[in-house]
């Protein structure tokens, strides 16, 4: 009946337009209410539970993120969803955030690439993706009312680039703006952010949705650039009738909502749960990060192995209380593969409580075995999705048992289940540490495959693991005073902080060991000078020097060696490119990266522009942020791009 979006808008009454933009349907025109499905509600409804973002990020693989997004999109579509409220495109500012499970990484390059690929996957299934929450949402404490004070350079270099990449490359149907304030302005009333930057600079053409509870003044919210503002529709009607809100603004918002509704597939499509579950196991394998290995791993057939810790039987596989129907524990997987294991609970999964008899049984079993695997991690109550953590410690019952077992068993392995870094006081005393994060319902099979050498660990840390909480960038400012959170660390988040201060860490950003080895050779640039508007190509050849198939993550960092003064300080290095390559034993492959002046630039608050200082830059290629295999010199000769 109505051929275009404009014709539909013209057919709406003022009250219907206001209702559409605040959550109501328009039945007479066949327009449903806009509904956004949460990821965890999708899982709880019987869908496959895939790795959380914190685990998927460890894959360092945009293609894996795209495949996971596509599967989630198919499952959401099978339930009739219009929009899926993922991904979170914020950064991991520190280790205590209650949002850690759903946040990808501490670095904007990695976060942006994975979020964009994930969005492409979701939307390939006919379901819209929502990039959220714009912007600078790094905690749960006072999140809806907090004023984040962040300087301009830090915003432009750290917290906005991941969103820009997600918007430009992922083309989401919607962006969610957060509650709270940014530098004194309500985020959902920030015209500079929502209109000038999001729509103007980044070219976003979808719908901007206000987070529930974020709207204080619906008229000001829509005027700033929001299209969907859960509030009393009557207030919008009154604002238009009084002249406080131009009806053209309401028309724009209604148009964007209608486009979003029409873009969603109207026909539910059944999901292939069998294929999706196989994918969940595959992705969980890619999420495992081998942090330390002195030879206890991989375990070997015929070894008698003690499995200790309740997580071996009751795995911690996700946040948000999902109830996946096909979760397999590490014990189930070991039994299926006829491993010689002996299980002792040792400590409970849901609390910090030491049972002395159980403690001694675990120590005795470990001493009698050929190896001991301790399944440790944070109880679910310590990582609630709506609350920040208070410390970085594992339960004392776990730390004590790990230390005691390590004293009697040289082949002690610790498997960690957590959404982020924890302090590991026993790290130097155990043989091996495998971090599985929250790897979804495929966790049990994946852990079994990685422990016993049926798969090679290829995950890399998407965040730095510090030695202790006091070392972290925002230790003195997190979570704020209840009114304001000061981001005084500026651009020094994650590895940028530790590198600038030359601080030791437990495990660095990008770190991850393997059962095979990789040799880098022939690193070179195709030119030693980069010019404005030009490009330079970096090449390196990587060879699998071991006897097992593996996947290496080649990481490229840029270091500013110009010596030019930088207000706010110079970042020692920043990730600019990465590539994951699968290699058979003896196989080698050339990895190629193309760099532009933007990759060597920093943001100038004085000029309100990105600038590349003339001089020398270091192109650093390696296995992690602290395992650099080649450094190449690059000159740049122009000051502004």
Model feature map: region roles:
Residues 1-605, 609-626, 640-641:
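Glycoside hydrolase catalytic-domain context in secreted enzymes
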Residues 627-632:
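Extracellular and select intracellular beta-sandwich modules with Ser/Thr-enriched
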Residues 633-641:
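Short beta-strand edge segments in extracellular beta-sheet folds
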